A protein has these predicted regions:
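C-terminal extensions
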Residues: 1-141
Length: 141
């Protein structure tokens, strides 16, 4: 499932942007989430869940976490939901990564960036390894 679904190596968000997002307070404006522009914001607002805030989007992500749902399946469920509602294809992995890593700060083990194959990513993808991993392991907190 992970090869077709969510993959953090497909994010288009720079490490700097992701780092700023992880360090910032959530304001509630859905476009504050890296990877969400006006088109995705409209899609979220017009979906059956009427997502208009960052808090609602985080709640949607958390709603896919069941008792026997591991981190990879959880991220995939959110990714496939984003696809089903018609969000911009090239930004889905960015949105999943942004929300998952932000929530990982409060809910340890909800996201596991080490579960993805970063060795087989392209050089460009290599720049966007998990910001959570980099900050945690490089002492940038």
């Amino acid at each position: 499932m992970a090869s077709e679904g969510y993959n953090p190596n497909r994010t288009r968000v720079s490490d700097n942007t992701q780092s700023q997002w992880l360090r910032s307070n959530v304001t509630g404006t859905v476009t504050e989430v890296p990877g969400i522009g006006e088109a995705t914001a409209r899609t979220l607002e017009n979906c059956e869940d009427r997502i208009t805030t960052t808090y609602q989007l985080m709640g949607k992500f958390l709603s896919f976490k069941g008792a026997n749902v591991g981190p990879i399946e959880h991220a995939d469920r959110f990714f496939y939901w984003l696809r089903r509602i018609g969000t911009v294809a090239g930004q889905r992995s960015s949105v999943v990564r942004a929300i998952a890593e932000k929530l990982q700060l409060q809910f340890p083990d909800i996201y596991d960036p080490d579960a993805y194959d970063v060795e087989n990513s392209t050089e460009e993808d290599g720049e966007n390894k998990s910001m959570w991993y980099n900050m945690q392991n490089l002492g940038k907190w």
